[in-house]
């Protein structure tokens, strides 16, 4: 089942336009997450997988509000600690490995991803390593799941959910 939404950007507002039918049983699920820190050894991947599978089953739109990745163990991060690295990520090209593994992990749910906010962890890496971790992840996810419409936003901004139900339109702003 494909997701029935599109994502567009207007200045600092990302709009998720959802199409539906005026039926008594119509509903749209949204999985709203933040601070997954997916690559951290303490991250609860079993719970994340459970939520992602449920989102796919419900045809939910996935919005991640930042810190999808921890990525604090890089060379230039003063908060880093080698004990905070999963064994499979303890390699020379640490950031590349985390991005590739994350894209593989989230690819089965890529079609449901609408929006990814840059969290303070990703922003710190961008500042110190001169690379946009969030955009690199989104690009890799799109390569693995071409149907993904994932958009990357900044640390601040707005998300508007616009519902197009037959000829009726209504919207809700998330700020």
Labelled PLM ranges:
Residues 9, 25-27, 169:
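Short, solvent-exposed coil/turn segments
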Residues 6, 33, 49, 131, ...:
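Residue-identity detector for threonine
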Residues 17-29, 33, 38-151:
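Core catalytic region of metal-dependent phosphoesterases/phosphodiesterases
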């Amino acid at each position: 089942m494909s997701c029935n939404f599109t994502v567009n950007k207007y200045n600092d507002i990302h709009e998720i336009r959802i199409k539906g039918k005026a039926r008594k049983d119509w509903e749209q699920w949204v999985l709203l997450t933040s601070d997954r820190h997916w690559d951290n050894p303490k991250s609860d991947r079993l719970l994340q997988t459970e939520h992602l599978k449920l989102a796919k089953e419900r045809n939910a739109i996935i919005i991640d509000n930042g810190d999808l990745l921890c990525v604090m163990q890089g060379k230039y991060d003063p908060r880093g600690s080698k004990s905070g690295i999963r064994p499979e990520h303890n390699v020379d090209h640490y950031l590349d490995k985390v991005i590739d593994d994350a894209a593989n992990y989230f690819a089965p749910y890529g079609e449901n991803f609408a929006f990814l906010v840059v969290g303070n962890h990703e922003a710190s890496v961008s500042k110190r390593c001169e690379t946009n971790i969030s955009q690199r992840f989104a690009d890799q996810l799109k390569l693995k799941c071409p149907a993904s419409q994932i958009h990357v936003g900044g640390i601040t901004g707005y998300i508007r959910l616009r519902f197009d139900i037959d000829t009726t339109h209504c919207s809700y702003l998330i700020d």
